């Protein structure tokens, strides 16, 4: 999974959709399940 500051380019891919889970914004892809992204997580 990629951690991106902006999901603009990720959500424009074919077959991808934006999902909110537990307050975080994810991009998941049905056509290519290996492609996933999350918007900027905090580093511990």
Curated annotation (Swiss-Prot):
One of its GO terms (biological process) is translation. InterPro entries: Ribosomal_bL36, Ribosomal_bL36_sp, Ribosomal_L36_bact. The keyword Oxidoreductase does not apply. Transmembrane segments: none annotated. The keyword Ribosomal protein applies. Keywords: Ribonucleoprotein, Ribosomal protein. GO terms for molecular function: structural constituent of ribosome. Belongs to the bacterial ribosomal protein bL36 family. This is Large ribosomal subunit protein bL36. It comes from Pseudoalteromonas translucida (strain TAC 125). The lineage of its organism: Bacteria, Pseudomonadati, Pseudomonadota, Gammaproteobacteria, Alteromonadales. The gene is rpmJ.
